[in-house]
A protein has these predicted regions:
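Membrane-interfacial loop-to-transmembrane alpha-helix junctions, especially the N-terminal start
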Residues: 9-10, 110-116, 164-165, 207-212, ...
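Transmembrane catalytic cores of multi-pass membrane glycosyltransferases
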Residues: 21-37, 41-64, 180-186, 198-338
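Membrane-interface transmembrane helices that cradle and orient dolichyl/undecaprenyl
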Residues: 146-167, 200-203, 349
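Membrane-interface alpha helices of multi-pass inner-membrane proteins
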Residues: 157, 166-181, 191, 215-221, ...
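Hydrophobic transmembrane alpha-helices of multi-pass, membrane-embedded glycosylation machinery
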Residues: 170, 174-176, 184-198, 273, ...
Length: 382
C-alpha cells in the first residue's frame, strides 16, 4: 500500500497562521482581565479580596472552574497571576490560529496560504463588525478568548465533507468551562450547523449527538449552582443599572446604532442571495444548497437573538435574558459570514470570475462598508 505523501503545504499553512496571529499580539494584558483576575487571585488565596463587591459571598461563580485552573497553574508553575495570564493568552492565539488553518483546509484546496492569511486577519480585526461591541478577537482576554477560540476550533471540525462531531462537542464543553457565555452561544452556532446538515440530508443522524450529553452535563455544572444561589431582584431596576448604565454598548439595542445593525445583517444577506441564485440556476449544486441553508439559518438566528434582546431589555426587562448576554451570539454569525465569503471567493476564482472573487475578498477584508457591500451585491447578481 502506497504511503500518503506528507502535506508540507498544510504544515506551512499552520505555521503561517500561528505566525500571522502573533502579529496581533498586544504588549499588555487587556484591562478587562482585572475583573476576572480578582476572582482568580481569590481562588488562589481566599484571604485576598474577601470584602470585594465582585466576589459572590454565598454563591457560586460560573467562572469557578476557570478560576481553579488559574489557581492550579499558579501553584504548579510557581508563577504570578500575570505570568499565568500571559501563558493563557498566548495559548489563545495558538488555538485561534489552528482553528483558522483547519477551517481554510475545509474551504479551499488551491488557495490555502492566501486564505489563511486573510481569515486570520479578519478574525483578529473582527472585520465584519462588532455588533453590540462583541467581536471575534478575544484572544487578549483570559478565558473569554480561550472560550471563543475553542468554539471556533469546534466549528472547524464541522465544515467540509468529513465531520468530527465528538471533537466539536468536546471543544464546546471546554469552552463552557472557560466562559459560560462562549460555551452557550457557541453551542447555538454548532446547532445552526447541525440543523443545516440535517435539513440538507433530509434525515436526523443521531450519531452526531453522541457528544451532546457531555456538553449538557458541563453546562449544568457551570450554571445550576449559580442559579440555585440567585437572589430575587427588581427587574426594572436591574435593567436600568445593568443595561442602561453599566453596559448599554453591549446589551441595549437602541444604543448600537441603526446603521451598524443594518450593515451587520446586510453582510449575512449577501451570501444567502449568492447561493440562492446559484442553486436556482443549477439544482444539482448540492453544496450551494447546504451553504444557502446555513446562510438562511444564520440570518434566522440573528433575527431571533435581536428580537429577544429587544424584548428582554426594552419592552419587558428580564434579568434572565439580560445576564445571558445574547448579543455574544452575533459574532459567531459574523464568523459564518466570513467562511461564506471565503467560499464565494474560492468558487468564483475557480470559474475564472476574478473580479467578482476580488470583490468578495474586499468585502471580507473591509467589512461593514456600504459601498463594498453594494458592489458585492451587484457582482452577485451578474
Amino acid at each position: 500500500m502506497k504511503k500518503k505523501a506528507f502535506d508540507y503545504e498544510k504544515l506551512l499553512l499552520f505555521l503561517l497562521c500561528i505566525g500571522f496571529s502573533f502579529l496581533f499580539y498586544g504588549k499588555t494584558i487587556a484591562v478587562e482581565n482585572v475583573n476576572y483576575g480578582v476572582e482568580q487571585l481569590h481562588q488562589y488565596n481566599h484571604e485576598l479580596f474577601k470584602q470585594n463587591i465582585g466576589l459572590m459571598e454565598d454563591g457560586f461563580s460560573p467562572r469557578y472552574y476557570a478560576n481553579v485552573i488559574v489557581s492550579v497553574l499558579m501553584n504548579l508553575l510557581k508563577m504570578s497571576w500575570a505570568g499565568v495570564a500571559t501563558l493563557i493568552i498566548r495559548a489563545n492565539f495558538i488555538i485561534y490560529a489552528v482553528a483558522a488553518a483547519r477551517m481554510v483546509c475545509k474551504v479551499t484546496k488551491e488557495r490555502r496560504l492566501l486564505f489563511g492569511a486573510i481569515l486570520v486577519s479578519c478574525m483578529f480585526r473582527s472585520s465584519l463588525g462588532t455588533l453590540a461591541g462583541f467581536g471575534l478577537n478575544g484572544a487578549m482576554d483570559v478565558f473569554i478568548g480561550t472560550g471563543t477560540a475553542l468554539v471556533l476550533l469546534g466549528i472547524s471540525f464541522l465544515i467540509g465533507e468529513k465531520k468530527n462531531w465528538m471533537a466539536a462537542w468536546i471543544c464546546l464543553s471546554l469552552a463552557t468551562l472557560m466562559h459560560v457565555h462562549e460555551g452557550m452561544w457557541g453551542g447555538c452556532a454548532v446547532g445552526v450547523i447541525w440543523l443545516t446538515v440535517m435539513i440538507a440530508g433530509k434525515k436526523i443522524d443521531w450519531k452526531t449527538l453522541k457528544g451532546l450529553p457531555v456538553y449538557v452535563v458541563v453546562m449544568l455544572l457551570v450554571t445550576v449552582p449559580a442559579l440555585l444561589h440567585g437572589e430575587a431582584v427588581d427587574e426594572t431596576l436591574f435593567a436600568e443599572i445593568y443595561v442602561n448604565i453599566r453596559t448599554p454598548n453591549h446589551l441595549l439595542p437602541t444604543a448600537w446604532g441603526t446603521d451598524v445593525i443594518v450593515k451587520s445583517f446586510l453582510l449575512l444577506l449577501i451570501p444567502a442571495l449568492f447561493f440562492a441564485i446559484r442553486y436556482w440556476k443549477d439544482r444539482s449544486e448540492t453544496k450551494s444548497r447546504q451553504y444557502l441553508i446555513l446562510s438562511i439559518l444564520s440570518m434566522a438566528l440573528w433575527l431571533l437573538i435581536f428580537a429577544v434582546q429587544y424584548f428582554g431589555t426594552i419592552l419587558h426587562p428580564s434579568s434572565t435574558i439580560i445576564t445571558m448576554y445574547l448579543p455574544k451570539c452575533f459574532k459567531y454569525m459574523a464568523y459564518f459570514a466570513m467562511l461564506l465569503y471565503l467560499k464565494i471567493a474560492d468558487l468564483l476564482f475557480d470559474e475564472e470570475r476574478y473580479l467578482q472573487s476580488a470583490f468578495a475578498i474586499l468585502v471580507l477584508l473591509l467589512g461593514c462598508d456600504y459601498s463594498f457591500a453594494v458592489t458585492m451585491l451587484c457582482a452577485v447578481l451578474l
